[in-house]
């Protein structure tokens, strides 16, 4: 929930992978109202992301980074009923909502059971929604101990 003028619900520019999420997941961002301008989130487009070497940008805080890349950030415009599926490796966040509309939104993360994890491991952070029978067979498989 992001109320107009509320400075307590801010997420400064970040990438979820910087906080331990797997680079092999995607996020479905679901706003429950029309979002635009400052009541939406911003994201660094993939084309710009690929041109920036974050290891070469001198910054100590999220605010420093925001100042360096702010001219490239794009605010998302989505109508109620639409969702954004995005690469959470891309820097994103929000700023103070300067509109008169409260933003209600939630997000869900999706990744394959078999894609690499980062700091947030299987069943520590993720719960499988659907495991196929072939996957269950593979999980249950025990290698015979031939002698």
For the regions a protein language model found, what residue spans apply to each?
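Catalytic core of non-heme Fe(II) oxygenases with the double-stranded beta-helix
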Residues: 8-76, 119
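Conserved double-stranded beta-helix
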Residues: 49-147
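Long, hydrophobic, well-ordered secondary-structure blocks that form the structural core
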Residues: 1-8
């Amino acid at each position: 929930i992001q109320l107009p003028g509320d400075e307590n619900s801010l997420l400064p520019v970040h990438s979820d992978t910087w906080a331990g999420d797997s680079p092999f997941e995607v996020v479905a961002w679901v706003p429950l109202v029309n979002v635009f301008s400052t009541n939406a989130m911003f994201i660094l487009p993939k084309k710009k992301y690929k041109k920036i070497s974050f290891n070469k940008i001198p910054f100590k805080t999220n605010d420093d980074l925001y100042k360096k890349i702010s001219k490239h950030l794009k605010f998302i415009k989505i109508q109620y009923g639409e969702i954004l599926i995005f690469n959470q490796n891309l820097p994103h966040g929000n700023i103070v909502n300067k509109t008169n509309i409260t933003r209600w939104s939630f997000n869900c993360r999706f990744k394959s059971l078999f894609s690499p994890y980062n700091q947030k491991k299987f069943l520590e952070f993720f719960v499988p929604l659907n495991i196929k029978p072939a996957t269950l067979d593979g999980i249950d498989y025990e290698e015979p101990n031939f002698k």
